[in-house]
Amino acid sequence: MTKRPTQRKQRSCRDLKAVMRRALLAPVGLALLLAAAGCDRGTSPKTVRKLAGSENAVHARQQAESEMRSIIAAWNEHTPLTLGLVTLYDGYGGGKAKEWFFASGDDQYKIRCSMYVTAYFGADPNHIADTIDGILTAGDANPAKIPFNHDFYYATQVAKYYRGEVGDPQGPGTGEPAQLFEATMPTLNWDQVRTNGQGRRLIEEPNPCPEASNDPPVRRCLHEPASTSVSELRRRYGMAFSLTFPVRDYFVVMK
């Protein structure tokens, strides 16, 4: 039976790569390397769009977004924080051609889909100790969605710091805290309220969505509501908090 052209090409590529590995140090090694690279190209934009719109990709995207929105809703409902803004960026990247040197791993997959989500809240700066402690109390009752609780020693010291019961939580001279962080968990940041001058850390505005950033299913960028800013939350409530989720690689197709 006559082999199809694709089968012949795949076999010739395998043979060429095997020869290349043996001859890499020979004078013809570089030429063979360049020829082999042509056998393993990056994922085309057409293929990226097709895979991004597949049933499996759509399901994975909906599940990842739903899980993070559920966590945000729990923070809004059970902590002293008031939700004001949610930003989401959803991007699909095609894999690269074979990386023979300085490999990054981007040549191992056809497509990788990643989601970036941050929620912004408002709170009263005059009651920040109660706010931090209220978050920990909510985490005691619902650790699956609010990972900070009273078992987190540093977080309890932060609450005591704002009550004036202890010094700088990270040690003498380290100054006012502005973050709670646990590996693989969302990171909580807030405006510093005791620090004045140029050294004061404030929650930054999210990056705007460029016009070209909305091209479903390949790219999505959302600001909900679009008219709200961090500075507006600060004016309304007195201070701002942000809850930033780790980058979620929710759909990957390997080569």
Language model feature labels by segment:
Residues 3, 9, 17, 46, ...:
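Context-gated lysine
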Residues 47-59, 99-144, 156:
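Terminal, regulation- and interaction-focused segments at domain boundaries
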Residues 1-37:
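Sec-dependent bacterial lipoprotein signal peptides
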Residues 39-88, 142-255:
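An acidic-aromatic pocket/loop used at catalytic or ligand-binding sites
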Residues 25, 99, 103, 227-229:
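Residue-level detector of functional hotspots within protein domains
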